[in-house]
Design a protein with these regions (language model features):
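Glycine-rich tight-turn/loop motif centered on a GG-T
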Residues: 51-60, 120-126
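Conserved C-terminal portion of the radical SAM core fold
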Residues: 1-50, 60-89, 96, 101, ...
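Radical SAM enzyme core and accessory elements
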Residues: 92, 97-100, 106-236
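Short amphipathic alpha-helical interaction segments
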Residues: 59, 82, 86, 124-128, ...
């Protein structure tokens, strides 16, 4: 069993929804021994036929930030997701409070990724943070975060109870840290702007030394060199 949970905050009272998420997490742990892989915290936002002023339960930014902090404290092992529904300012604040997964360069309309520019009249919701992926990656690194494109656990079948055991023992760091740096390296080599690549190379050189397991660290350094030479798809 491997699940993600979440609600759209603002449809009903946020206290009910917040407690509901935590009770759901508690039930999953008790019944299955496996909590949520991720918790998503979107909030009601403008769209073609939606005005947030019509929703009396819409959540102000300061309350939204408290919701993120409470969930992070209560479920320290889960990945917490925020989308481009939220503004750059809000996303920056909640990254400091517990968000670990964000989107960048998102399109919410049908077929939105097929053309560089297209009519967004079919968009599911309005995007508040309209920066490109490169701009988001650059921004994250300037704040000291490691942008990771890793999907190694899913690809290796490291989900459910296998994933939880790594998380709760803290050993996941010996997978996540090098995988994050290697996938960032791939992005820098293949897609990044010159400025983003320069910042990223400096970040990788600093962070690779922090991988706790010596054998993993040495192998990751070797893989990073091979990525520079054009090889791809290394993972722990």
């Amino acid at each position: 069993v491997d699940v993600g949970v979440g609600v759209v905050f603002g449809l009903v009272g946020y206290r009910y929804e917040r407690v509901g998420i935590l009770m759901h997490e508690e039930h999953l742990e008790a019944a299955l021994g496996v909590g949520p892989h991720t918790i998503s915290v979107p909030s009601i936002c403008p769209a073609d036929d939606i005005d947030t002023d019509d929703f009396s339960n819409a959540v102000p930014d300061e309350i939204f930030e408290k919701i993120v902090a409470v969930i992070r404290i209560a479920v320290p092992y889960t990945g917490m997701i925020i989308s481009t529904r939220e503004s750059q300012k809000t996303r920056e604040h909640v990254l400091q409070l517990g968000i670990s997964q964000i989107s960048g360069g998102s399109r919410t309309s049908v077929g939105g990724y097929t053309e560089p520019v297209r009519d967004d009249s079919s968009a599911q919701f309005d995007v508040s943070d309209t920066r490109t992926l490169d701009e988001v990656v650059n921004w994250l690194m300037k704040m000291g975060f490691i942008p990771s494109f890793c999907t190694a656990c899913y690809r290796a079948g490291r989900t459910g109870d296998r994933f939880m055991s790594l998380l709760k023992s803290g050993q996941i760091v010996n997978c996540c840290q090098p995988n994050a740096l290697m996938t960032l390296k791939e992005y820098l080599e293949d897609y990044a702007s010159p400025e983003t690549k320069e910042i990223g190379e400096s970040l990788i050189a600093k962070e690779i030394r922090k991988v706790p397991n010596e054998k993993v660290r040495e192998r990751a350094i070797q893989y990073l060199e091979e990525l520079k030479e054009g090889k791809r798809d290394f993972r722990f």
